[in-house]
């Protein structure tokens, strides 16, 4: 029983850490009331992500089932005493609402700014006055230094105007232009 309870809390903490440190979303961890908990669970814990409108989005849950489901489905294992025992079970998960939460947290009227840790491209180097001597070479050198530092980066040396490029990559969610 203790191991299952520890697993329930471990997963809750993993989710909270992921939301805060990877997705850059503030969270509140808590325990659901008896009326709110998962049907059949002894305890349900939640990670609530805080949105800009001051509302919370339930983004992940972790449940401790005890041995109730194991008894209902006659699930047993042989213990150290070679006798059958019902395991204590857990269940935990996040859902696609996490994607909506990212958009609600990091989006605005101009698009989405993805958190740097999940952005496919973290930095786009946009040369301005690319027709002037040395500008493209300097921009390429900057891109290369960023890549060498492990930053997912690219340079846009297309014929589109700098303004178009800034708008395009802002809309695509690139964190740094």
Language-model segments: residues:
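NTP/phosphate- and nucleic-acid-binding module
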Residues: 1-177
């Amino acid at each position: 029983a203790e191991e299952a309870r520890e697993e329930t809390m471990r997963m809750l903490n993993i989710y909270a850490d992921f939301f805060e440190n990877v997705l850059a979303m503030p969270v509140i961890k808590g325990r659901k009331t008896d009326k709110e908990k998962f049907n059949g669970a002894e305890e349900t814990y939640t990670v609530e992500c805080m949105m800009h409108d001051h509302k919370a989005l339930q983004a992940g849950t972790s449940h401790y089932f005890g041995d109730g489901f194991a008894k209902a489905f006659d699930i047993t294992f042989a213990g150290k005493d070679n006798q059958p025992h019902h395991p204590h079970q857990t269940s935990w998960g996040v859902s696609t609402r996490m994607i909506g939460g990212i958009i609600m947290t990091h989006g605005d009227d101009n698009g989405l700014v993805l958190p740097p840790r999940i952005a496919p491209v973290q930095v786009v180097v946009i040369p301005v006055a690319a027709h002037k001597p040395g500008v493209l070479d300097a921009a390429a050198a900057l891109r290369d230094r960023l890549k060498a530092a492990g930053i997912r980066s690219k340079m846009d040396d297309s014929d589109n105007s700098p303004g178009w490029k800034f708008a395009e990559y802002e809309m695509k969610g690139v964190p740094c232009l």
